[in-house]
């Protein structure tokens, strides 16, 4: 196993910062070999099966092409949950967890209706439904592929979310597709806007 770890580090050291290489090593060994970081020392002399070595080689080659590790492995962690991801959806971002946490803190134990616009992988909608037991969560996306992924993620995490395919930029259609009175609207599109002021009700 020590040789495999050295191979990963040597292959990636010119492409990624040292801290990221270390994170990639931990993630690859955990997902491919089921070896956690605190077991590395005890398993250092373990001979990995050829199937695992081949899988690791494929992963490293894709990483050398700067493909995101989440797409390579097919999953991403978000707010202590695991989500399926592929190129049809964006990879959940760490800063999105802050948005989700704020909504959870503000609405704990409330019977509310939440709309997630542009749900993508469903990470926001599924996580909110997981933690806000009394809430009803509706998630929309214009992409049928993204909604299919989001539905699988809801099932994967044992949650019930209402998924609707609609174009939120078409107000008349969106109003017909989402005939609900809403309490909270959330969205985290692939860009961010820094709003002035400390008390910002726009999430």
Regions found by a protein language model. Name each.
Residues 44, 57-132, 140-152, 166:
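SAM-dependent Rossmann-like transferase core, predominantly class I methyltransferases
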């Amino acid at each position: 196993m020590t040789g495999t770890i050295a191979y990963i580090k040597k292959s990636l050291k010119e492409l990624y910062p040292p801290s990221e290489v270390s994170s990639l090593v931990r993630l690859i060994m955990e997902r491919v070999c089921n070896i956690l970081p605190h077991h590395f020392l005890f398993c250092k002399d373990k001979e990995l099966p050829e199937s695992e070595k081949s899988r690791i080689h494929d992963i490293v080659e894709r990483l050398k092409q700067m493909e995101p590790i989440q797409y390579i492995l097919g999953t991403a962690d978000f707010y202590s949950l695991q989500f399926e991801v592929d190129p049809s959806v964006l990879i959940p971002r760490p800063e999105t967890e802050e948005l989700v946490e704020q909504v959870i803190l503000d609405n704990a134990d409330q019977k509310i209706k939440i709309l997630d616009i542009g749900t993508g992988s469903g990470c926001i909608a599924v996580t909110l439904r997981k933690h806000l037991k009394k809430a009803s969560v509706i998630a929309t996306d214009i992409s049928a592929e993204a909604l299919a992924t989001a539905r699988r993620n809801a099932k994967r995490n044992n949650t019930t979310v209402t998924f609707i395919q609609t174009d939120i930029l078409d107000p008349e259609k969106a109003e017909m597709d989402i005939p609900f009175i809403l309490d909270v609207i959330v969205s985290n599109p692939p860009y961010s806007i820094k709003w002035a002021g400390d008390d910002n009700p726009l999430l």
